[in-house]
């Protein structure tokens, strides 16, 4: 298959990449998220991703975001490479960070998400949504195509929680080699109980599903999508099961989804422990773009770990690659740039 499937041909005149950075204390649960060397270090992952995408290295965070045990470099290396090759404009959006990066961020004044086993996981959902919607309205005259990514450790568990609350079965993907699905199911079960929910009980109250079982990335992305509604701006949600959960909320809110698509990596689609493809079919997502960076051909062992499913997606990597494809970047050109980024970081060796 082409490195972006289905192949993209229409090059936008005014594209933009947005990356929502958030934290949820759900990621502090041991062995739940691999988006950091330890559960505590996941607090730094979104900030580290932003610094790496912006500067090519980390500035304020103590350690480069990597996935153990092979120190597979963060998907942010792909996002940086794609944005560097395309020179597309981009912004980072702080929606509930514990640690803020030393690079410019648009602040939505959101608090970090709580552990979903608490009765309230996200406070001020409506406020975050409205501020993000206002931001999109300010941006929409400047663009005709927007790709929205995310960086939030623990986000696949909150995605599972929201999907359950809305009435969708299905496993979610993971940042780990071995997807801790049983642990995720247990955490979601405890969260549903703490909030007095049952499967599908919030299908008519999607914003409450975020408040009880979600994370602060969700209302930010949904608010952005709301702000682009009714315009000629094409919106691509960059991510795997997390963005499928966001799409589910959007659908339950009754938004027009004709100009919406999802872009993710081949590694999410091929994850046998998750049901991403089935979920997107159930949700009737108009288009799902699949990006394949071809890391099996790389000389760097750390990049080979992507091919084995050690790490799959994050920091809008799939959407950033989709954007690179729109600009005519080839798979070989892209992989070469990723290798350059890794060598400068001394990562993935």
Swiss-Prot record:
Record organism: Methanosarcina acetivorans (strain ATCC 35395 / DSM 2834 / JCM 12185 / C2A)
HAMAP family named in the record: UPF0284
Gene3D superfamilies: 3.40.50.10210
Protein's name according to its UniProt entry: UPF0284 protein MA_3887
GO molecular function: nicotinate-nucleotide-dimethylbenzimidazole phosphoribosyltransferase activity
InterPro entries linked: Nict_dMeBzImd_PRibTrfase (IPR003200), Nict_dMeBzImd_PRibTrfase_arc (IPR002805), Nict_dMeBzImd_PRibTrfase_sf (IPR036087)
SUPFAM superfamilies documented for this protein: Nicotinate mononucleotide:5,6-dimethylbenzimidazole phosphoribosyltransferase (CobT) (SSF52733)
Similarity-based family: Belongs to the UPF0284 family.
């Amino acid at each position: 298959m082409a490195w972006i499937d289905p192949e993209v041909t229409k090059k936008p005149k005014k594209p933009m990449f947005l990356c929502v950075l958030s934290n949820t204390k759900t990621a502090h649960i041991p062995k739940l998220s691999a988006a950091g060397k330890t559960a505590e270090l996941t607090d730094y992952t979104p900030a580290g991703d932003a610094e790496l995408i912006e500067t090519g290295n980390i500035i304020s965070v103590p350690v480069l975001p990597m996935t153990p045990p092979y120190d597979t470099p963060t998907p942010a290396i792909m996002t940086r490479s794609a944005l560097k090759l395309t020179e597309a404009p981009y912004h980072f959006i702080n929606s509930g960070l514990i640690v803020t990066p030393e690079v410019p961020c648009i602040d939505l004044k959101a608090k970090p998400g709580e552990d979903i086993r608490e009765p309230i996981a996200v406070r001020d959902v409506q406020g975050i949504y409205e501020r993000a919607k206002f931001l999109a309205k300010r941006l929409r005259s400047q663009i005709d195509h927007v790709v929205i990514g995310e960086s939030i450790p623990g986000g696949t568990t909150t995605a599972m929680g929201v999907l359950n609350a809305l009435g969708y079965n299905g496993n979610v993907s993971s940042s780990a080699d071995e997807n801790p699905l049983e642990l995720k199911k247990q955490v979601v079960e405890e969260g549903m109980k703490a909030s007095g929910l049952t499967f599908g009980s919030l299908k008519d109250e999607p914003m409450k599903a975020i408040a009880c079982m979600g994370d602060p990335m969700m209302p930010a992305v949904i608010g952005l999508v709301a702000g682009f509604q009714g315009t000629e701006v094409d919106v691509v949600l960059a991510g795997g099961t997390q963005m499928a959960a966001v799409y589910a909320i959007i659908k339950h809110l009754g938004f027009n989804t004709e100009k919406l698509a999802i872009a993710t990596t081949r590694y999410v689609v091929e994850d046998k422990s998750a049901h991403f493809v089935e979920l997107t079919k159930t949700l009737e997502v108009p288009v799902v773009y699949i990006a394949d960076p071809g890391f099996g051909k790389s000389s760097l062992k750390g990049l080979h770990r992507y091919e084995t499913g050690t790490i799959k997606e994050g920091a809008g990597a799939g959407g950033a690659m989709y954007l690179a494809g729109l600009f005519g970047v080839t798979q070989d050109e892209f992989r070469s740039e990723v290798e350059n980024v890794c060598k400068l970081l001394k990562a993935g060796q």
